[in-house]
C-alpha cells in the first residue's frame, strides 16, 4: 500500500518488522543513519511555574519539593554554553519554567541568544507561550529554534493540563513560524494515554503548515509529588512504534530521543535509533530529569557505530 494512501493509524499498528523497515528506509532517504545530532539543554530558570502540567516537577501546583530559582545570570549561561561547545555540542538549548516570558526578563533572554550565537552554536529556547512581538524579538536576536511541545493528543490534553489549552500551544507554534523561527515540537508518551492519542499527537505535528524541524519524543519519567508519579511505565515497543511513525510522517525532521533515555537499556535505545531517532541531549541532566552521562553515551555510540553530527553538517536542533 503506498505510504501516502495509508492513515497514521495503519502505519503505527502494522506488524513491527514492516514498520521498522519502512521507517529505516525513509530515514536513509533523508539522513545518514549512523549520524546523531547532539544538543545540550540548560535550565535557565527552574521551578515555580504557574501551569499545572501533571507530569512536571517544576509546577508550583504540584507536590514536588523543587525550589523555584531566579533567572540565571547571562554570563553564567554563556560560561555553561562554552563548556557545552568544548564537549562537542553543536547547539545550545535554554529552558525557563514560565507560562510566558515577562518583559523584565526579555533583555537578559535576548543577550543569552546573542552570546551563544556568537560562539558559533545554533540557539534554541523554550520559554512558554509567546505573543507575536516576543517571537519577532527572539528572531531578531538570532534565535534559530523555539521549542513548544503539544505534549499529547487534543483529546487527552485536558487530562494532563488545564491552565492552558491545546489551541494555545498551536497558536504559539504559528506565531513562531510566522516570525521565521524554526519549530521544535513533540510530546510525551507514557502518561496514561492510548495508542490512538499518540497517533493523533503525531498527526497534529505532521499537519502543521510546516512540520517541525525537530520532533522530541519524551518518555515520561514519573516525578515524586506530581499527579503522574505512579503511572505504569509505557511498554518499550510502544515507544519504538511512536518513534518509527514520527519518522515516516515527518521524513525530513530530526526525531529526538529525548527524556527517558536514562531508564532505557542499550537495546531499547538501539531500536529507537533504528526506528528513525537521530537526535539526543547530552549531559547528565535534562531540566530536572536525569540523563545518561556523556561517557555512557560515548560507549553506546561506539557499540552501535554511531557518530555525533559535526557543526559544519548540522542543520536542525532544539529542546526537549
Swiss-Prot record:
Documented EC number(s): 2.8.1.6
Q: Which residue spans traverse the membrane? A: none
Q: Where does [2Fe-2S] cluster bind?
A: 93, 124, 184, 256
GO MF, one example: iron ion binding
Show the InterPro entries listed in the entry.
Aldolase_TIM, BATS_dom, Biotin_synth/BioAB, Biotin_synthase, Elp3/MiaA/NifB-like_rSAM, rSAM
Q: What class of enzyme is it?
A: transferase
Q: Catalyses which reaction?
A: (4R,5S)-dethiobiotin + (sulfur carrier)-SH + 2 reduced [2Fe-2S]-[ferredoxin] + 2 S-adenosyl-L-methionine = (sulfur carrier)-H + biotin + 2 5'-deoxyadenosine + 2 L-methionine + 2 oxidized [2Fe-2S]-[ferredoxin]
Instruction: Tell me the PROSITE patterns matching this sequence.
Output: RADICAL_SAM
Domain Radical SAM core intervals? 34-261
> What protein name applies here?
Biotin synthase 2
Q: Which gene encodes it?
A: bioB2
Amino acid at each position: 500500500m503506498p505510504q501516502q494512501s495509508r492513515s497514521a493509524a495503519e502505519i503505527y499498528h502494522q506488524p513491527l518488522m514492516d514498520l521498522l523497515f519502512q521507517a529505516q528506509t525513509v530515514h536513509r532517504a533523508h539522513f545518514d543513519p549512523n549520524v546523531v545530532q547532539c544538543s545540550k539543554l540548560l535550565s535557565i530558570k527552574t521551578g515555580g511555574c504557574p501551569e499545572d502540567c501533571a507530569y512536571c516537577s517544576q509546577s508550583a501546583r504540584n507536590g514536588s519539593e523543587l525550589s523555584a530559582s531566579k533567572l540565571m545570570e547571562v554570563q553564567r549561561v554563556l560560561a555553561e554554553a562554552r563548556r557545552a561547545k568544548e564537549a562537542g555540542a553543536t547547539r545550545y538549548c535554554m529552558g525557563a519554567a514560565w507560562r510566558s516570558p515577562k518583559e523584565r526578563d526579555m533583555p537578559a533572554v535576548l543577550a543569552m541568544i546573542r552570546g551563544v550565537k556568537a560562539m558559533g552554536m545554533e540557539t534554541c529556547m523554550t520559554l512558554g507561550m509567546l505573543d507575536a512581538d516576543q517571537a519577532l524579538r527572539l528572531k531578531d536576536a538570532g534565535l534559530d529554534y523555539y521549542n513548544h511541545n503539544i505534549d499529547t493528543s487534543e483529546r487527552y490534553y485536558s487530562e494532563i493540563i488545564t491552565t492552558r489549552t491545546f489551541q494555545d500551544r498551536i497558536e504559539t507554534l504559528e506565531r513562531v513560524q510566522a516570525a521565521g523561527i524554526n519549530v521544535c515540537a513533540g510530546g510525551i508518551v507514557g502518561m496514561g494515554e492510548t495508542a490512538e492519542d499518540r497517533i493523533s499527537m503525531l498527526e497534529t505535528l505532521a499537519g502543521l503548515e510546516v512540520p517541525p524541524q525537530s520532533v522530541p519524543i519524551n518518555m515520561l519519567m514519573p516525578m515524586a509529588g506530581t499527579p503522574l508519579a505512579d503511572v505504569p511505565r509505557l511498554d518499550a515497543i510502544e515507544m519504538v512504534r511512536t518513534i518509527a511513525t514520527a519518522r515516516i510522517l515527518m521524513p525530513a525532521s530530526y526525531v529526538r530521543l529525548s527524556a527517558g533515555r536514562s531508564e532505557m537499556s542499550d537495546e531499547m535505545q538501539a531500536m529507537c535509533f533504528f526506528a528513525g531517532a537521530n537526535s539526543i541531549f547530552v549531559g547528565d541532566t535534562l531540566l530536572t530529569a536525569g540523563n545518561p552521562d556523556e561517557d555512557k553515551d560515548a560507549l553506546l555510540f561506539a557499540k552501535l557505530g554511531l557518530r555525533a553530527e559535526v557543526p559544519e553538517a548540522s542543520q536542525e536542533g532544539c529542546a526537549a
